[in-house]
């Protein structure tokens, strides 16, 4: 599997009741989205995107929001002058799921188009 394989996938609804990915499983998927980092004992996936100004960061955050709404899998987004921080976690399982990596790959693809 590579990042292209991840972007071809759709998020599947997570109803909870399943275990989150282990740190080892998350590390294997992280290889496909190398600009992202695991945080909080491998329960979150985070990347900070850099921009020339606040409005570019705000526009990117809006595009990420639209993408995530279409997939039904929503990140925590933080913006400030020259940056947009995107953090995924599957809240129903309090950890990471393949959906988080699918969305990270799709956000990377969106950033490459910007």
From Swiss-Prot:
Enzyme class: lyase
Biological processes, Gene Ontology terms: tetrahydrobiopterin biosynthetic process
Gene3D superfamilies given in the database record: Transcriptional coactivator/pterin dehydratase (3.30.1360.20)
EC number: 4.2.1.96
Reactions that this protein is recorded to catalyse: (4aS,6R)-4a-hydroxy-L-erythro-5,6,7,8-tetrahydrobiopterin = (6R)-L-erythro-6,7-dihydrobiopterin + H2O
Annotated disulfide bonds: none
Assigned keywords, A-Z: Lyase
Molecular functions per Gene Ontology: 4-alpha-hydroxytetrahydrobiopterin dehydratase activity
Entry annotated with the keyword Cytoplasm: no
SUPFAM superfamilies, per database record: PCD-like
CDD domains registered for this protein in UniProt: PCD_DCoH_subfamily_a
Protein family: Belongs to the pterin-4-alpha-carbinolamine dehydratase family.
PANTHER family: PTERIN-4-ALPHA-CARBINOLAMINE DEHYDRATASE-RELATED (PTHR42805:SF1)
Protein name, per record: Putative pterin-4-alpha-carbinolamine dehydratase
Organism: Methylococcus capsulatus (strain ATCC 33009 / NCIMB 11132 / Bath)
């Amino acid at each position: 599997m590579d990042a292209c394989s991840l972007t071809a996938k759709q998020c599947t609804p997570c109803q909870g009741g399943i275990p989150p990915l282990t740190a080892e499983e998350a590390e294997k998927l992280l290889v496909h989205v190398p600009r992202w980092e695991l945080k909080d004992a491998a329960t979150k996936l985070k990347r900070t995107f850099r921009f020339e100004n606040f409005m570019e960061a705000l526009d990117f955050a809006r595009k990420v929001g639209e993408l995530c709404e279409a997939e039904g899998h929503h990140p925590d987004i933080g913006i400030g002058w020259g940056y947009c921080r995107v953090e995924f976690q599957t809240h129903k399982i309090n950890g990471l799921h393949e959906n988080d990596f699918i969305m990270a790959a799709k956000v990377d693809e969106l950033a490459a188009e910007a």
